[in-house]
Design a protein with these regions (language model features):
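A glycine- and Lys/Arg-enriched "phosphate-lid" helix/loop adjacent to the NTP-binding pocket
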Residues: 66-84, 92-144, 190
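Intrinsically disordered, low-complexity polar regions and short flexible loop motifs
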Residues: 15
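Hydrophobic positions on the alpha1 helix immediately C-terminal to the Walker A/P-loop
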Residues: 9-10
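Conserved nucleotide-sensing/catalytic segment adjacent to the nucleotide-binding pocket
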Residues: 20-82
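NTP-dependent small-molecule kinase module
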Residues: 121, 144-191
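Conserved nucleotide-binding/hydrolysis micro-motifs of P-loop NTPases
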Residues: 31-34, 59-62, 105-112, 166-170
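Short glycine-/polar-rich loops that comprise or flank the Walker A/P-loop
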Residues: 19-23, 49-52, 93-100, 121-124, ...
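Short, small-residue-biased leader/transition segments that mark boundaries at the very start
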Residues: 1-2
Length: 191
């Protein structure tokens, strides 16, 4: 199973009681020049082996939103990604990967509140990056690219699950409930 997530704290919530040998936390960071030109190969290496769960802090979908807006990829790379990603995911699923794509959505007001709280907190100031401040100024572009991503990459076998994350705990519980209901396991009770 492969889960796409945006926040490391949500991943911690999901994985807190899992046995460490059965899941991977994947945070790839800034791509090398080669990885930037071989986007799908970069992510293929990070996928789970049979019987494992991988939690992706960010995912291949940074190519669909963040990278083109921030100038980290060119138009050709963006278009190539958008053209190929559905088939790539379809192949993953045919080869046994159970893919769940969560998108944790945050309102602009809530994003600004959280950024201000981080900026003014002695415990959280380090979480605020220069990119965070740039991103808020490009909110409309992010919204446009996000909508394009949903429209072009939500498929019947690989839909997006959009979670309102203005309230962090409700978002985590909602996504966990979704995942538990979707997953088959012994003595399952639908919640």
């Amino acid at each position: 199973m492969c889960i796409r997530d945006r926040k490391s704290t949500a991943i911690k919530f999901f994985s807190e009681y899992l046995r460490p040998q059965h899941f991977n936390y994947v945070q790839l960071g800034i791509p090398t020049k080669w990885e930037s030109s071989h986007w799908f190969q970069r992510w293929t290496k990070a996928l789970p082996k049979e019987g494992e769960i991988s939690f992706l802090d960010r995912s291949w979908y940074t190519r669909a939103i963040t990278e083109p807006i921030m100038g980290y990829c060119n138009e050709k790379q963006y278009r190539y990604f958008m053209k190929k990603v559905n088939k790539w995911e379809e192949d993953l699923i045919k080869n046994g990967v159970e893919l769940t794509k969560f998108y944790f959505s945050l309102s602009k007001d809530q994003q600004q509140i959280r950024m201000k709280a981080r900026k003014n907190s002695e415990l959280k100031y380090w979480k605020l990056s220069k990119n965070d401040e740039k991103i808020i100024t490009k909110w409309n572009a992010f919204t446009l690219y996000k909508e394009q991503m949903f429209n072009k990459t939500a498929t019947e076998i690989s839909p997006w699950v959009s979670i309102n994350s203005n309230n962090k705990m409700i978002a985590r519980l909602t996504s966990l409930r979704y995942l538990l209901n979707k997953t088959d396991y012994e003595d399952k009770k639908i919640i």
